[in-house]
Amino acid sequence: MADAQAAAAGKKKYKNKKNSAEKNPNHNPNSSGQVEAQTPSNGHVQHQEEEATEDQEPAQELRGLLKKMHLCNGHGHKEQEARPLGEVVNGHAHGHSNNNHIRCTSGSSNNNNSTHNNNSVDSSNNNRKQRREGGDGGGSDSNSLKPEEKPITATSKTTANIHPTTTTDPKPKVSEDVAVEQGVHVATGSGHSREQERKQPPSDYAEGATPTITAQLQLPEPAISADEIVYKEYEAEHQMHDIMRLIQAELSEPYSIYTYRYFIYNWPKLCFLASHDNQYVGAIVCKLDMHMNVRRGYIAMLAVRKEYRKLKIGTTLVTKAIEAMLADNADEVVLETEMRNQPALRLYENLGFVRDKRLFRYYLNGVDALRLKLWFR
């Protein structure tokens, strides 16, 4: 019974102390001999005022039980009000540590300084450095508030989210401006370097390529003049094989050796050759006989090597053959050529030949031919 009365008396006395503490929050606990609350392991600070006298063991046991009950529930003292939004966002207020979230209701600057750890110091240094870089020289640091400006409980006037909201807005702008300026410098630098690279290699290549080009221009090309070509008549049998190889290489229509012999043996004076450096580069084979009471000359074959064209070799050979036919009283000259052979058509038409007749599928390859004719009388 005595224990129950003592416990009730202690509980009543504790409630009175608690009510007086709530009414006078600025009351200094050191002046009344009360002991400051200990920081529990769950990260919340509880300030419980105990009496200086230790002779009342039941009261102490009751306070211990109440303290355990508060710890088990996960809540601190009623003095621990809800955190402001800025404190929750930033994780610290009034110099409190970011990791421990310690609140000091006593308002003592010494106690607040004792709750700082290395993390809060580092964060304050980083905030100062960022504000200096951002150009906010007049902004105050949220972790370095004056003692007289620090209230007992966290309020909206001294929360840490006020200063960051005013200082963090210009900081990204400044960083963006700096980044833009740096990007411009980098871009201009890369542009200059690229322009130099674009300008420099072509000059190097040009310098390296100039000697080659000049060397190629200085090389004497094997230019052959028309005066170097030698024209002669057919002379002997040993020229037969050279004529055959030349014509077979240039003409599409195959001829047997008997065809060559027919023309060359019967009209050797109407066969002319063009040579250069003792090599035959052109040949013409013709005939002249009676056709319907008319002496008709006929150009059977004309060939010039490709590398010796554009030297008027073909024109010269045809002219020599026509002159020989005229000397033998020829009345006309005829020939056939492919319709798609435009160089041959131009050659003969320039000499006075006209298109007389179209011969369908005249050649073995199925190509049509055009008959050209030149009249003397």
Swiss-Prot record:
Q: Where is the composition biased (Basic and acidic residues)?
A: 192-201
Family annotation (PANTHER family): N-ALPHA-ACETYLTRANSFERASE 30
Which residues does the UniProt record annotate as the domain N-acetyltransferase? Answer: 229-377
Q: Where is the composition biased (Low complexity)?
A: 90-127
What GO cellular component is one of the record's annotations? nucleus
Q: List, alphabetically, the Gene3D superfamilies matched.
A: 3.40.630.30
Q: Where is the composition biased (Polar residues)?
A: 26-45, 153-169
UniProt keyword annotations, A-Z:
Acyltransferase, Cytoplasm, Nucleus, Transferase
Lineage of the source organism?
A: Eukaryota, Metazoa, Ecdysozoa, Arthropoda, Hexapoda
The disruption phenotype is: Flies are viable but display a 'held out' wing phenotype, characterized by the abnormal positioning of the wings, a typical feature of muscular defects. Flies also show male sterility, reduced longevity and age-dependent loss of motility due to developmental muscle defects.
What's the protein called, per UniProt?
N-alpha-acetyltransferase 30A
What does the sequence similarity comment in the record state about its family? Answer: Belongs to the acetyltransferase family. MAK3 subfamily.
> What is the uppermost EC class here?
transferase
* Annotated Pfam families: Acetyltransf_1
**How the protein assembles, per its UniProt entry?**
Component of the N-terminal acetyltransferase C (NatC) complex, which is composed of Naa35, Sbat/Naa38 and Naa30A.
Renumbered to this chain, region (Disordered) spans: 1-208
